[in-house]
Amino acid sequence: EICACLVGSEMCIRDRSGENAAYYKAAMSGNRRRSDGSLIPGDAMFVQQTAGLSQPLGEMCPYVYEHAWSPHLAARYEGNPPELPVIRQGFEAVCSRNDYVTVEGSGGILCPLRAENGKTLWLEDVIRALQLPSVIIADAGLGTINSVVLTAEYMQGKKLPVKGILFNHFHRGDTMEEDNIAMCRQRTGLPVLACIPDGAQELPMEPTDLAALYEEVSLT
């Protein structure tokens, strides 16, 4: 199956290209409740509606929390802490029915998904377990050099494959933002895959270039 960690909005392009596409996220917090008390997986709903996916919301994310906290803290207060086997099972089920699966990260690479009773689970553990190549998503503005370089060097040091960088909220001609991008490229050695302007509805990449970011993942 072909899976990758990419920005969720790319699904708009992939879905319209005629391929069978899907979305997956291990855990998401900061979600509203329906009138019946059940939680609405907000990020998943946004992708579903934006991309016009027929994929059911219920299979997009196995762990959904109300508090807008790091997932580990939300789970500590609300219960139902993330379990890696459950995350993997859900991912494999989505992969079995789709050609392309986009996996969105839960916070940054060092986001804790679980930390209680001596059990810990970090986003990097999920990426490694699911054998996902990744794309770093970053804001083009002030402070991005430090966050991008630290993320890239951490992932490279942990032998987690990184395909490149996508910059959000980009303003062409902005001196600082263009320098930020150049410095990130120079220091990390990673390609800049695209710079996404504010308000863009689609990822400014050719479908063939986008598809090349995905890799076949052996699921056993």
State each model region's role.
Residues N20-A21, V101, S134, V162-K163:
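Hydrophobic anchor at the start of a short beta-strand
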Residues E116-E124, V149-A152, E177-A182:
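Charged helix-capping and loop-helix junction motifs
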Residues K25, V135-A138, K163-H169:
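Short internal beta-strands
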Residues E153-T220:
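C-terminal lobe/tail of nucleotide-utilizing enzymes
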Residues I87, F91-G118:
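Switch II (G3) loop of P-loop NTPases
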Residues E1-G8, C12-I13:
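Single conserved hydrophobic/aromatic residue that forms the stacking wall/gate
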Residues E116-A140:
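Inter-motif core of Ras-like GTPase G domains
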Residues R14-P81, P85, E92-A93:
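N-terminal phosphate/diphosphate-binding loop that engages ATP/GTP or pyrophosphate donors
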